[in-house]
Amino acid sequence: MGLPPLSKIPLILRPQAWLHRRHYGEVLSPIRWWGRIPFIFYLVSMFVGWLERKRSPLDPVVRSLVSARIAQMCLCEFCVDITSMKVAERTGSSDKLLAVADWRQSPLFSDEERLALEYAEAASVTPPTVDDALRTRLAAHFDAQALTELTALIGLQNLSARFNSAMDIPAQGLCRIPEKRS
């Protein structure tokens, strides 16, 4: 049995819980584990907010796909759930979401998305397998600001997904994908 979630959200995190309810309709589960260390929860939340800002040099779909792939790699149920919701919202369908695990074989992804997903996978394995050839292709496609933010996003998603997976934080049903009818 893992560490149980907090039954009561700390007072200092209640404004964040209110924002969750406002945006998602419910409080997101990780606050009940991260809430044991509110300062770090706020730092992670601010980091997420910065990377998800409207003026980010990274396309929102690219950010969502990268996060979804890392969530899958880390076997984080909660992260797969929330990133799936974001991919579906940002692409307007579930097509890319359903194909992200097999992005290499799918014709649905742009060159930019493929490069970002390749980098996310290479940077997320232990040890990372980012080589000079990949760095050269990344530098040819992304400017320094975008590449730095992409790398930060990969690092942050790994932190979040690994924490949530290790704590066994469950999915919340944020992204319900309808089953295909035969």
Curated annotation (Swiss-Prot):
<comment type="similarity">
    <text>To M.tuberculosis Rv2313c.</text>
</comment>
<dbReference type="Pfam" id="PF02627">
    <property type="entry name" value="CMD"/>
</dbReference>
<dbReference type="InterPro" id="IPR029032">
    <property type="entry name" value="AhpD-like"/>
</dbReference>
<protein>
    <recommendedName>
        <fullName>Uncharacterized protein YnjA</fullName>
    </recommendedName>
</protein>
<dbReference type="GO" id="GO:0051920">
    <property type="term" value="F:peroxiredoxin activity"/>
</dbReference>
<dbReference type="InterPro" id="IPR003779">
    <property type="entry name" value="CMD-like"/>
</dbReference>
